[in-house]
Each structure stands twice: as C-alpha cells, then as structure tokens.
Design a protein with these regions (language model features):
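Short, well-structured N-terminal submotif of metal-dependent ribonuclease cores
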Residues: 1-36, 50-60, 131-135
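Short, flexible helix/strand-to-coil boundary loops that buttress conserved ligand/catalytic motifs
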Residues: 13-14, 48, 87, 121
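Active-site-proximal, substrate-binding regions of enzyme catalytic domains
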Residues: 43-71, 78
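A generic structural signal for short hydrophobic patches within well-formed alpha-helices
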Residues: 9-10, 41, 117-118
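Phosphate- and divalent-cation-binding pockets in alpha/beta enzyme and binding domains
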Residues: 21, 43-44, 82, 119-120
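A short acidic, often aromatic-flanked loop/helix-cap motif at beta-alpha or helix-coil junctions
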Residues: 42, 78-81, 130-135
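Acidic, PIN/NYN-like endoribonuclease modules and their adjacent C-terminal/linker elements
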Residues: 1, 67, 73, 104-135
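Active-site neighborhoods of divalent-metal-dependent phosphate/nucleic-acid chemistry enzymes
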Residues: 71-113
C-alpha cells in the first residue's frame, strides 16, 4: 500500500519531466491500495486556487481522487507529536514530516520524488521502482 506524496501529483498536474512515469503508475496501480494525505490535497488546493483554477481543482478531487478510489488519510491533533518526532529525527520540514507520520501510522510506503525521505527509516520509492519490482 502506498502514500502518494504531493510532488507526484504536481508532476502530473503541471506536466513536468516525469509526467509519463506518473501516468504509467496510476494506470497500472491498484488504486484501492493508494492513499493521499489530507495535507497533500490542501497543498494542491492552494496551488490550484492561487492560479484561479477553481473548477480544475474540483475536477481533480472528484475525478482523480474520489472517483478513482484513492483514499484520503489524516492525522488528528493527538498524533501531531509524530510529526515533530519525524521532523526532529530525520531533519524534515513540516510537509515531509506530516507525510512520514501518516505513512508510518498507516503502514504505507511513501511514493515520492523527494530525496529528503532517503534520510528516514522508511525511505521512499519512485513510481518507476514499483514497475520494476512488479514485472
């Protein structure tokens, strides 16, 4: 089961250099085993709305998240110590520490292009790694 980091969605939304790798991942993945944090959705919402892409944001949430079966996870305030623990132990900023805490709490592998996760116990995988291990 996988927690998809914000930068994976940004690669897709902004059509960056690894967009095809991301598209391949989503077309091949069992989306019932794919998760996103509420923090990622909020971050993506900030980006969409800053660009005045209100309808595009709703389309993304409704079609790419809800209709596809991707699950949304969050942390309650009682679990926020897990964020600060990860930030302190692995020298992560808030968004990475939040993702790490969610992945750790729910037993998920982090799918990310962010090398900061390489400093953690859990590490990370990139979409391309998942293709190689399942061929």
């Amino acid at each position: 089961m996988f927690l998809i980091d914000t930068n994976i969605f940004l690669e897709y939304i902004l059509c960056r250099s690894r967009v095809q790798e991301v598209k391949d991942f989503f077309s091949r993945a069992d989306l019932s085993k794919v998760y996103v944090s509420d923090f990622s959705l909020h971050s993506l919402g900030v980006i969409y709305l800053r660009e005045r892409k209100l309808l595009e944001f709703l389309t993304f949430v409704n079609e790419d998240i809800i209709a596809s079966g991707i699950h949304v996870l969050s942390l309650v305030p009682d679990d926020f110590s897990k964020i600060t623990d990860a930030a302190g132990q692995f020298h992560l900023d808030f968004d990475d520490a939040y993702q790490y805490a969610v992945a750790e709490q729910y037993g998920l592998s982090i799918v990310s292009f962010d090398k900061d996760f390489d400093r953690t116990k859990m590490g990370r995988v990139v979409p391309e790694d998942l293709f190689r291990s399942h061929q």
